[in-house]
């Protein structure tokens, strides 16, 4: 209901107006949250569960006394919708708003602060009035890198999520550029969606979903079909994708603590092979998932027999080295260095570990550290021609970097010198002008003093 519909007069308080004319927006229809639209918003889209929303608001008690206002702080209030970060009335009310809309909400205590209140400003069992302006809203950034944005259409059940290796059954609809390219029910193992033409972003998002949850996922190229695209679906390289996904059911995979050493070693051999298949196919993020399982299972495994310990160390060394190579391909050089460090912790003279750490550090412009690693490679294997070439590359890059720095600093100092000279010149000019004015004043004063006697009897 808009403010003009049935408004009595300008003198009636906003609280009374909402109480009499407001729309009941509660699911129970118990008049616990009443709403009047003061300014209609733009479009038809409203915020969804988990969206980050930006609002300005004023809050008053039923007697008209203001207890809070974002305007007084000169900054919007930001929260995630439907996550219990605000009072119930806000989660209900803001979910009905459109961008740019201003509304009035009247909230009964059970939808606000209840019998506890929020002392000292809000007493027990207080009915509250709010004026809210919805400035903006956007989906939940699942990994804080902009690669997967989730908008939840329907909240899931319970608190359990699928884990890596879980068996899931989902319904999905994929769109690109407004065209639907995929629509089906499918069952698969989380982390292995690629085997079913499902992008890695779906695997990642499923680990944050609950049973029966329905959401829209916006996938950047990194989490979609990447540089290769997907000719089967007519998807071009580096395309952005939109998927609507419903998690119908899932069965979690065994956690590490539920497996004995024998089972872990058996599974390590299986996932190592899967990881290698993904790596050879250019599916580096999928390969990371498989190699990462080996680390999660075996890195903290204790009390092994000599035979088990040897097998475990072999799997871990291979996993860290392969993870380092994956991270190099993914341009995550810091992670590549960390994995090499762990591999070298198991085998300090490992040629691949030293070489790959050198590669990562060279790409991070850590020329001296990289050169040191390549020199160690030659100590292990003097015949490694690639390492010798990389040492030359380190020296060349370091020289170029130093020369570039010298040019930058030289230009910087030149500008500073020119600026100082200009300021000195301006000071000198100002001083000269000042002296000229003083001399002129002095001359005029003398002339006046000389003329003064002549003007009097």
Swiss-Prot record:
What are the ranges of the TPR repeats?
268-301, 317-350, 351-384
Q: What are the entry keywords?
A: Acetylation, Chaperone, Cytoplasm, Isomerase, Nucleus, Phosphoprotein, Repeat, Rotamase, TPR repeat, Ubl conjugation
Disulfide bond entries? none
Gene Ontology cellular component terms for the protein in this record: cytoplasm; cytosol; extracellular exosome; membrane; nucleoplasm
Extract the ranges annotated as region (Disordered). 1-24, 420-457
Tissue specificity, in the record's words, reads:
Widely expressed, enriched in testis compared to other tissues.
Q: What is the effect of changing residue 28 to R?
A: Decreased acetylation; promotes interaction with AKT1 and PHLPP1
Where Phosphoserine occurs, residue numbers?
Answer: 13, 445
Q: Which GO terms describe its biological process?
A: chaperone-mediated protein folding; protein folding; response to alcohol; response to bacterium; response to cocaine
Q: Which residues carry this modification: N6-acetyllysine?
A: 28, 155
As stated in the Swiss-Prot or TrEMBL entry, residues carrying the post-translational modification N-acetylmethionine are 1
Tell me the ranges covered by the PPIase FKBP-type domain, including all copies: 42-130, 157-243
The protein's Enzyme Commission number: 5.2.1.8
Induction conditions: By androgen.
- Reactions accelerated catalytically: [protein]-peptidylproline (omega=180) = [protein]-peptidylproline (omega=0)
Q: Which domain of life is it from?
A: Eukaryota
Bias kind Basic and acidic residues: ranges? 1-11
Any Pfam family the entry gives: TPR_8
PTM details? Acetylation impairs ability to promote interaction between Akt/AKT1 and PHLPP1. Deacetylation by SIRT7 promotes interaction between Akt/AKT1 and PHLPP1, leading to suppress Akt/AKT1 activation. Ubiquitinated, leading to degradation in a proteasome-dependent manner. Deubiquitinated by USP49, leading to stabilization.
**Outcome when changing residue 155 to Q:** Mimics acetylation; impaired interaction with AKT1 and PHLPP1
Assembly and interaction partners: Part of a heteromultimeric cytoplasmic complex with HSP90AA1, HSPA1A/HSPA1B and steroid receptors. Upon ligand binding dissociates from the complex and FKBP4 takes its place. Interacts with functionally mature heterooligomeric progesterone receptor complexes along with HSP90 and TEBP. Interacts with NR3C1. Interacts with Akt/AKT1 and PHLPP1; enhancing dephosphorylation and subsequent activation of Akt/AKT1. Interacts with IFI44L; this interaction modulates the kinase activity of IKBKB and IKBKE. Interacts with IKBKB and IKBKE.
Function, as annotated, reads: Immunophilin protein with PPIase and co-chaperone activities. Component of unligated steroid receptors heterocomplexes through interaction with heat-shock protein 90 (HSP90). Plays a role in the intracellular trafficking of heterooligomeric forms of steroid hormone receptors maintaining the complex into the cytoplasm when unliganded. Acts as a regulator of Akt/AKT1 activity by promoting the interaction between Akt/AKT1 and PHLPP1, thereby enhancing dephosphorylation and subsequent activation of Akt/AKT1.
The protein here is known as Peptidyl-prolyl cis-trans isomerase FKBP5
> Which gene is this protein's source?
FKBP5
